[in-house]
Design a protein with these regions (language model features):
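Conserved N-terminal helical subregion
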Residues: 2-9, 16, 26, 51-195
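Conserved hydrophobic helix-helix packing surfaces used for dimerization/oligomerization
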Residues: 9-11, 32
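Residue-level detector of alpha-helix initiation sites
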Residues: 15-16, 41
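Short, intrinsically disordered, charge-balanced linker/junction segments flanking boundaries
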Residues: 194-202
Length: 202
């Protein structure tokens, strides 16, 4: 299919991936429509690590300053045995780390990261943000794609990007790779305010 550049690119999913894709397209002056099935743009979950590569992406998207204001940049990273508490290894993530990789290592809450992305998308006149818009079906018609939403609407675009998560309906129709496979690994996580963090951890 040859894309129709007169139509916007449709993006199914208004999470971190979908909003980042919309901003990247806007950098190239390509309009897009972000379709989120929820009633608002929210991200559940806990913390997420921000390595040097993603910080370089933030710079390209023009959101690095907003991220730096709310992310936390530790000077050290420790890995301890979950049962004994014994230190396994330690990584210096301070100035030497920044010099070596050209960007810092940080951590941020997934919801805070999405807030920055959503605000950046909403401030762009090239990005249309739609909530309560769940893609049910899509069809390629000549040089454009048509999507049908759960509430009966129809939208047209030059292409369709699937950013609708692990249970993606679009991916299942294109790749047909089956349901996600449980890895068998379990992670215990918690979110605390800085005032609740023990002093020795700080």
């Amino acid at each position: 299919m040859t894309p129709n550049t007169e139509k916007p690119i449709l993006i199914a999913g208004g999470g971190i991936g979908g909003c980042a894709a919309a901003l990247a397209l806007a950098q190239k002056q390509i309009p897009s429509i972000v379709m989120e099935k929820a009633e608002e743009f929210v991200e559940i979950g806990a913390g997420i690590q921000l390595g040097p590569n993603v910080h370089k992406m933030f710079i390209k998207l023009g959101i690095e300053k907003a991220i730096e204001e709310i992310a936390f940049y530790p000077k050290n990273m420790f890995m301890n045995d979950g049962i004994t508490g014994k230190l396994i290894t330690q990584v210096d993530t301070g100035e030497k780390f920044r010099e070596r990789f050209g960007a810092p290592y940080g951590v941020i809450h997934r919801g805070d990261l999405l807030d920055v992305l959503v605000k950046a998308c909403e401030s762009s006149n090239l990005i249309t943000m739609l909530t309560s818009t769940e893609v049910e079906e899509f069809d390629e018609i000549e040089n454009y794609v048509t999507v049908s939403t759960r509430d009966g609407r129809s939208l047209q675009g030059s292409a369709l990007i699937a950013a609708d998560g692990i249970w993606s309906k679009i991916r299942s129709k294109i790749v047909n790779d089956g349901n996600p496979i449980v890895s068998g690994h379990v992670a215990y996580r918690a979110v605390l305010s800085i005032s609740e963090v023990p002093e020795f951890v700080k």
